Amino acid sequence: MSDENKSTPIVKASDITDKLKEDILTISKDALDKYQLERDIAGTVKKQLDVKYGNTWHVIVGKNFGSYVTHEKGHFVYFYIGPLAFLVFKTA
């Protein structure tokens, strides 16, 4: 695991319960430890959330992106781990 991956997540925006947020941060950190490619990290997080919390999760991981999304109430978090931004949300 690189030093960048050891960074504490920094939440920039959220509409989510603390329990769900902590679970998403843990799943994301684990995926970051396991994979190098952003699409693999995003895919792993999405699949785990779909299994654990039901379908229609969306996960975007990268260093430079814009977004404008609609999400299910209580199911949105935007955070950084090291240099990577994570946008995670669920739609109905």
From Swiss-Prot:
Pfam family, one: Dynein_light
InterPro entries noted in UniProt: DLC_sf, Dynein_light_1/2_CS, Dynein_light_chain_typ-1/2
Keyword set, alphabetical order: Cytoplasm, Cytoskeleton, Dynein, Microtubule, Motor protein, mRNA transport, Nuclear pore complex, Nucleus, Protein transport, Translocation, Transport
Example of a GO cellular component annotation carried by this entry: cytoplasmic dynein complex
Taxonomy, superkingdom: Eukaryota
GO biological process, one term: nucleocytoplasmic transport
SMART domains: Dynein_light
Localization of this protein: Cytoplasm, Cytoskeleton; Nucleus, Nuclear pore complex
A GO MF label: dynein intermediate chain binding
Function: Acts as one of several non-catalytic accessory components of the cytoplasmic dynein complex that are thought to be involved in linking dynein to cargos and to adapter proteins that regulate dynein function. Cytoplasmic dynein 1 acts as a motor for the intracellular retrograde motility of vesicles and organelles along microtubules. May play a role in changing or maintaining the spatial distribution of cytoskeletal structures. Also a component of the nuclear pore complex where it may contribute to the stable association of the Nup82 subcomplex with the NPC.
The family this protein is said to belong to: Belongs to the dynein light chain family.
Identification of the protein by name: Dynein light chain 1, cytoplasmic
Species per Swiss-Prot/TrEMBL record: Saccharomyces cerevisiae (strain ATCC 204508 / S288c) (Baker's yeast)
Gene that produces this protein: DYN2
